Amino acid sequence: MQEPLLGAEGPDYDTFPEKPPPSPGDRARVGTLQNKRVFLATFAAVLGNFSFGYALVYTSPVIPALERSLDPDLHLTKSQASWFGSVFTLGAAAGGLSAMILNDLLGRKLSIMFSAVPSAAGYALMAGAHGLWMLLLGRTLTGFAGGLTAACIPVYVSEIAPPGVRGALGATPQLMAVFGSLSLYALGLLLPWRWLAVAGEAPVLIMILLLSFMPNSPRFLLSRGRDEEALRALAWLRGTDVDVHWEFEQIQDNVRRQSSRVSWAEARAPHVCRPITVALLMRLLQQLTGITPILVYLQSIFDSTAVLLPPKDDAAIVGAVRLLSVLIAALTMDLAGRKVLLFVSAAIMFAANLTLGLYIHFGPRPLSPNSTAGLESESWGDLAQPLAAPAGYLTLVPLLATMLFIMGYAVGWGPITWLLMSEVLPLRARGVASGLCVLASWLTAFVLTKSFLPVVSTFGLQVPFFFFAAICLVSLVFTGCCVPETKGRSLEQIESFFRTGRRSFLR
C-alpha cells in the first residue's frame, strides 16, 4: 500500500516515490546549467518584479512627504493616505484578473511585456501629479502592472527553468521585487517624491528591450501547436550542445494529454482542484501574515513607535535585510526543500509579530526627535498623547522585530508561495488558476491595507500584529497538513503525482 503524500515517517518530507536511475534526459539536464541563456531570459522577465517591488513601497517615503506638503491639492489627510496606500492592491487585483485571460491568450512573455504600458503610464502620472486623482490613478495603473506580472512571471520562469535550478530561479521574482523595494528606500533618502516616480520608468524600459530577444515558454508554444518553434526555444534555453529531445518529448506528451482548456466540470476533479486549492490558500495566508500593510506603511509604523534611529534609515535597513534573506532562500531552496523553509519562515514571523505587538502594547510612546507622524492620531503630524522619554536600547525592539519578520517572510513564505503556485498548478489551468490566485491575494491585500489605519486608530497599533501572529500559527499547521514537497521534481512529475490514486493530502 502506497504512503500518503503527507504524514509519512522521516525527516526529509519526501512526498514522491524514489527516483529511478538517471535517464539520458536527467544527465543531459546537467549540461543546461552551463548555458547562461536561461538565466538571461529569467533576468529579463523578473525586471517586471523589480518594478513591482519598487511601486509597492513607493508610498513608504511619499506619504509622510505629502502629509507635510504645503500644496493644498497634494496635501494628504489620514483617509486620503489610506487610499493612496491601498489602491495599488485594487489595481493588482485587476491585473491578476486580466492575467486569467492574457496568460493563455498572449502567452507568458507577451503578457509580461504588455504590463510595461500601464506601469510606464502610472509612473508618468505620479511624477507629474497636480492633484489627488492623478496620484490615485497612477498608483492604480502601477498596481495593475504589478498584478499582471505577479501572475505571469512565476509561470514563465518555472516553465523555462530546468528542474535542478527551478527552486533558485523560482526565487528570483521575489528577489528582484525585494531589490526593487530596497532601491526605492535608498533613493527615498536622496530624491524628492516626484523623481522617485521618474526613476521607476528605467527598469520598465530595460525589461521591454531585453524580453524582445527572449523566447516564449516552450510549454505555451506546444499548447498552441507551434512544435518547431517550441523545440527551437527549448534548444536555445538549454544550449546547442545539449540533446533536448528527451525533455521535449516529456513536455510534448504532457501537453498532448491536456490539449484543451479545463472545463468547470473538470475543475472539480481532485487532480485539478487540489493543487489549485493549495496554491490559493497559500497566497491568502501569505497576505494575511501582514506583509503588504507592513511594507506600505513601514516608515509610518516606525514613526509611531519609539525608535532609536530616523524612520527613513530604519526602512532602508529593513529593505537590505529583506534582500539578503531572499538571496539566502534562493541559494538554499533546492537543498533544504520547500517545506522546511516554510516551517522556519512561519515560526520566525510568529515570534516577530508577537514581539512587536507586545512592545507596542507595553512599551514607550514614540520619541519626539524621530517621530514625524503617528498612525494612531487623527493627523500623522500630531500625536494624541504626550511623548515619553527614551527607554535606551529598548527602543531598538521595533526595528529588530521588523527585521526579524521581514527575514522570516523572505526566506520562506515570500518566494516559496510564488514558486509553489507555478509548480503545482496543472498546465491546462495554469494561466487561469495563477490569475485567480493573484486576484484573491491582492483583494485580501487591499482589505488589509485599507483597514489597517482605521483598525490602528480604533484599537491600537498592537492589534494588527497580534492578528498577524495568529495567522502565522495557522500557516504552520497548513504547511504540515497540506503543502507537498516539490524539490527536484519536474513539472510533469508533480502533475503526474496529483493524477495518481493515492490518498489525498487534503484531509
UniProtKB/Swiss-Prot annotation:
Membrane topology note: Multi-pass membrane protein
Cytoplasmic side: 1-37, 103-111, 162-168, 216-289, 336-339, 417-435, 484-507
A GO BP annotation: dehydroascorbic acid transport
Chain ranges for the short sequence motif Dileucine internalization motif as given in the UniProt record: 5-6
Expressed in which tissues: Highly expressed in brain, spleen and peripheral blood leukocytes.
Residue ranges of the region described as Disordered: 1-28
Keyword line: Glycoprotein, Lysosome, Membrane, Phosphoprotein, Sugar transport, Transmembrane, Transmembrane helix, Transport
Upregulating conditions: By lipopolysaccharide (LPS).
Protein localization: Lysosome membrane
One of the record's GO cellular component terms: lysosomal membrane
GO molecular function: D-glucose transmembrane transporter activity; dehydroascorbic acid transmembrane transporter activity; fructose transmembrane transporter activity; transmembrane transporter activity
Stated role: Probable sugar transporter that acts as a regulator of glycolysis in macrophages. Does not transport glucose.
Protein name, entry field: Solute carrier family 2, facilitated glucose transporter member 6
Name of the encoding gene: SLC2A6
